[in-house]
Amino acid sequence: RNLFFIVLMFFAVFQVMGSEKQVDTTELKKGDKCPEFVFKDARGKEHTLSELKGKYVFIDVWASWCYPCRKEYPYLQELEKKMEGKNIVFIGISCDHIEWRWTGALKMGKMGGVQWWIAGNESFLKAFRADRIPRFILLDPKGRVLELNMTRPSDSETEKYLLKLKKI
């Protein structure tokens, strides 16, 4: 009985020590270059944000279960249409923990545009301090953080801000 308890404690300590090594606590600040996080699209193909270099990148961090996220989506689509032809790309990044919830939300919500899934990559959420969603982030054409907490698409200031960007 004591041996079982010792073995159990050994595994518990090993798990805690092992998980600490995997946690990336780096938090990004304005002006920081965005790391190479890997995301998946609905077909399973891997992508990184560096693929979008040369354009401003407006990131919408959302989840299928998030009502405020879904409420912003029509405004995001409208903003994307207004900015068509400009030097900006809009991308949705789902932080759903389960892939089928994300893909189901894509189908049910008839969500268009570029949609990626974090695929369990919690370091993305930690780096951007995205502990609450929806979260909107803006990267500059060089892949640097311009805004960590961008205003929502439903806020009229968002469009005004974007139109004032250099070489938009």
Predicted feature descriptions by range:
Residues K40, T103-K142:
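Short, internal strand/loop/helix patches
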Residues R1-Q22:
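Bacterial Sec-dependent N-terminal signal peptides
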